Amino acid sequence: MNYEEIVCDANNLYRAYKVSVKSSKWKESTQKFMMNFLRYIFEIQDDLMNRTLQNGPTQEFELHERGRIRPITSIQIRDRIVRHSLCDEVLLPEVRKHIIYDNCASIKGRGISQQRKRFEIHLHKYYQLYGNDGYILFGDFSKFYDNIIHEIAKRELLKLFDDNEFIDWILTLIFKGFQIDVSYMSDEEYATCMTDTFNKLEYRNIPKEKLIGEKWMEKSVNIGDQLSQVIGIYYPY
């Protein structure tokens, strides 16, 4: 099957549906979706095949995690199904071929326990060579997801698929949903917004009446979004 057939395959969409509702079955909206899931799955399949798919509405909230406040944008179940079918069946299998084995983030079957095992292995190897003479460097990229440039992320992903037309179309659609309304910016601020550091948490304090859709910034992805997790482990800049 080609990439379009893989993403649109009813069995793959069904698997994506099961993953998408797994942690939210207690929600009323999820329960309503589950009552008619077959009809919705085939509607999604039809929209994908006819290129009529549109991004659904989102909900914003904040997550307090390890002493940090993270701005989260939640998407509808329909959109989650599309993301999972695309990422789980097409993007991640290809991305895995191009990342180091010790990268355990967002990779099924690895995770924190696997990362701990690999960390211990590296510690033992280092001790055998150098004993206690050494140190560990711990780093973090501040506002990493907030400042991912769409053009670069999309270009690098498309390289893995020889600029496939279907992958190009669906990535373009999803990235359009990531765009940030920066109508509140002056012309001078807008001219440098792609290189200036963006802070989504501060952005949420901007009055809604200033966000009128006149200026859009093609930078930043949503934390927790399935595609964002793939981009996070492969984004080269």
Model-derived segments and spans:
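Short, compositionally biased low-complexity segments
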Residues: 7-24, 55-60, 87-95, 127, ...
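Active-site-flanking structural segment that lines cofactor/substrate pockets
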Residues: 39-68
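Active-site-proximal segment of RNA-dependent polymerases
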Residues: 3, 89-150
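Conserved pre-motif C helix in the palm subdomain of viral-like polymerases
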Residues: 69-100, 214-237
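Glycine-/proline-rich flexible loop or hinge segments
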Residues: 20-31, 62-73, 100-102
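Conserved polymerase palm-domain catalytic core
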Residues: 129-237
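Non-catalytic, polymerase-adjacent accessory regions of viral genome-replication enzymes
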Residues: 1-47
